[in-house]
Amino acid sequence: PPSSGGGMPVYNAQTETEMYSDEMLELARVVQSRVLEILNITGAPSNKISAEGMRPKVEDALDQALREIRHRIPGSIQIEKFRAVLMDDLIGLGPLSPLLRAADISEIMINGPDNIFVESNGIQYRTGVRFNGEAHLQSIIQRIVEPLGRHIDAASPMVDARLDDGSRVNAVIPPLSLDGSLVTIRKFAAKKLTDEDLIRFGSLSRPMAEFLKE
């Protein structure tokens, strides 16, 4: 992704939706299943492979799996970008990872696996990223809350927690949510907004800023 003036990653609003097309999501499932097979791990990606110490083994297995299915990857898809998406799924937080890394995003709102919105510079917009179905979304929710010592399931379908960086997470899953899981992540601001920032975003007029200083 591009970088802000401070060297922090900034989310690119022009995310290629082709990377998250039905075809590519299905291909991602195939690759991930093959990675787990190579690593001799049963079940969905979990803390078994998300630990940082597993990263080199996961990368090697992923590279092998990508070589095996390279002929199925459309020519318009950048292999390195697809690889990064898969690594985020395997040891990160899936499609949320680039959004969480982006310095210009203050809030992430998820309304089911296909609807991910963000707030950036005071403006809300829909992203082009998607989860690989409701089960994928719920697995990422579990990956978020489990390290915090929290639990979410059908018997306890709502969780409110704070991440290590101060960001707030609220998640609701079925049956409490009727049309897929709902997640809101309010990111902790690494940089305090100045009056000039608020004026630039349109949240504050210059006369009002001058008045508040008096």
Predicted region positions:
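N-terminal anchoring/assembly modules that precede and organize ATP-driven motor systems
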Residues: 1-125
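P-loop NTP-binding catalytic core
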Residues: 102, 110, 115-214
